[in-house]
């Protein structure tokens, strides 16, 4: 079967934006104009096609990056038909993982900005991720019909806040209620969209007189940018010759794909103006799969050589699984981006990460919530595979004879944990199935059982992230659960060395109990990774060998439950060196108790301390909020380790802060910086808890022990 659309007419793009920039409405209009969607869905009525999970419809924010395929031949049918695969990305900072995941498989991105709000914090986060994966981008300034809309201010912010190089391709005709259309700076014509046909039709007119001068000023800026593409154009420009429209298009395309410039468009998706022109730009300036560098990977040889896969049907098959979803009708869906080669339904692929072969069942192309069956997928395609058994997010699927492992995605460590408990016994099993499925879909969500409390602990990227996962558990899996408060895992250890006696004697009628030991306790280096060591140096059999294991067991059981404040004890070496026994009354239990008693007393005499987890925190913030953020980190017992300058006037602060002080930080950092600062944190080390804090924790725990001598 031949390829339906030539590869050079493919565009794999993402639409990315801050929460309220109107990205979903923009995507809806794209689907409408490209003929996929016949009735326009509105986010604020909760019916947008791309937002197909129930909570997204309720909250009006996009959570899952759904992949959709559509076709476009230009506003005036001036191009051959192009295939556009759109990946919708979420705009909330807790879903950064989704954005990162989609950036990884895109060839280009369209950044949507609100004409009133401009460049906002999530825009900065998304921008950094697009930089990381070197994704070419264009910008669309939406909501030009709103009070306070200002295209030129947003253009300036892209330059100053993001360090981008924006180039206006159109300028607006009017603004707010008077926004009527745009001026195309290449053709120098005014474009007005027809209201009756919901913007399907348009007409070109002469530029309004009052905008002629402004249009000429911005056109000369555009031509100069185009002339910088190569020497021939530069010479032509410097000699005062006019560049042709074709030359300008080719130059802007080249510079956009090289990540040198950001073409900017504007409009109002809600009023059906401007999105059509931006779609033309996707075809004109966004890269086809073969315009971006070939994907790199590691070949399956001894030396682990780096290899590449060219975007071509003739190259060996290689694809990346970038999202796993559960569909209520077909079950497990694995979204893949095919980089090279062809695969047909029923054929097998190899997963080098799991070292397994899997057979491809059905292949479906997704349109938001409906799907079309395919017989095969080829280089450049984005589609979903049904029924893959053991494929995780970020895994490679490739030809078994030509094995390559594509660069894996990096997933951040979760920063917040909560305990969840099923409300009834019946919910218990459903809950573990639900959590398992959700963790498979979302690599930034982890589940484990706390050994100390037996509770199920879920961890994720933020409070909203966990809230939505708990919500999905309720809706999709019908599991009712109680949620606990966020917790910190403290530890206990000793700083000094002691020798301590432990005696356990019971004398009741008949056989008694007798165990007697001397232990030496000393601290171990916490960085060594060894939490406990037991040695025996008993001379002359004063404690018979068969009881040594019991002493060790008594110590370990005592360590598990802590002594100072009920937290596990780490970093202790115990040496059994002396003691005594009784022929009749001694047994294993007696020596287990004696070991436990000696350890408890010795621990309290060996300068015991409480340890707390310390996190490595990185905050990226515009300079004007730096003072507030530094002051706040100091109040949280943070130690600032260093600072760096980032492009666009952003500062990066690196600090070490105790986890106990970081709860609620996401909300604080947003309010201190009007939402413009972002942060990440990961576990760094365990460190001694200051005395005042430790006393507070110990006060809550009053250890009641019934050991007797």
UniProtKB/Swiss-Prot annotation:
One of its GO terms (biological process) is ribosome disassembly. It is found in: Cytoplasm. Signal peptide: none annotated. GTP binds at residues 17-24, 88-92, 142-145. The keyword Hydrolase does not apply. Keywords: Cytoplasm, Elongation factor, GTP-binding, Nucleotide-binding, Protein biosynthesis. GO terms for molecular function: GTP binding; GTPase activity; guanosine tetraphosphate binding; translation elongation factor activity. One of its GO terms (cellular component) is cytoplasm. Residues 8-290 form the tr-type G domain. Pfam families: EFG_C (PF00679), EFG_III (PF14492), EFG_IV (PF03764), GTP_EFTU (PF00009), GTP_EFTU_D2 (PF03144). Catalyzes the GTP-dependent ribosomal translocation step during translation elongation. During this step, the ribosome changes from the pre-translocational (PRE) to the post-translocational (POST) state as the newly formed A-site-bound peptidyl-tRNA and P-site-bound deacylated tRNA move to the P and E sites, respectively. Catalyzes the coordinated movement of the two tRNA molecules, the mRNA and conformational changes in the ribosome. Belongs to the TRAFAC class translation factor GTPase superfamily. Classic translation factor GTPase family. EF-G/EF-2 subfamily. This is Elongation factor G. It comes from Psychrobacter sp. (strain PRwf-1).
